Amino acid sequence: MSVYPECTWLLFVCLCHLLVSAGGSLLLPCEPINETISVEKDGCPKCLVFQTSICSGHCITKDPSYKSPLSTVYQRVCTYRDVRYETVRLPDCRPGVDPHVTFPVALSCDCNLCTMDTSDCAIQSLRPDFCMSQRASLPA
């Protein structure tokens, strides 16, 4: 038996390990990024589109092969750690409608459990700049 098949197998295993290690470092970490978002509300005919900081990136998760009905699996997602709140004014709102909308600005992010009260935890959601009504932009 030749020594080459064993060396080939060892080389294959080493290359697979390197590719897996490199692949993990190519994923973007969970951190604040600049993103175009939109805000709108009932009684205001225009959707306001602007840039802000949101949390985005990869969090290491584990999904067990065996899922026991007695245990709970917790998946970590990239979510806000520290935030600052800013307020914008929507244009052309009807009389009696408060034109102000307050939104979080990401100062730092963390891989943590998804909080449904403050985050969109859907598997697939709308783009952050999706508008149902006519678009308007913040003045430069």
Swiss-Prot record:
It is found in: Secreted. This is Gonadotropin subunit beta-2. It comes from the Eukaryota. It comes from Anguilla anguilla (European freshwater eel). The keyword Nucleus does not apply. GO terms for cellular component: cytoplasm; extracellular space. Keywords: Disulfide bond, Glycoprotein, Hormone, Secreted, Signal. Its main location: secreted. One of its GO terms (biological process) is G protein-coupled receptor signaling pathway. Transmembrane segments: none annotated. Disulfide bonds join C30-C78, C44-C93, C47-C131, C55-C109, C59-C111, C114-C121. The keyword Disulfide bond applies. Glycans are attached at N34.
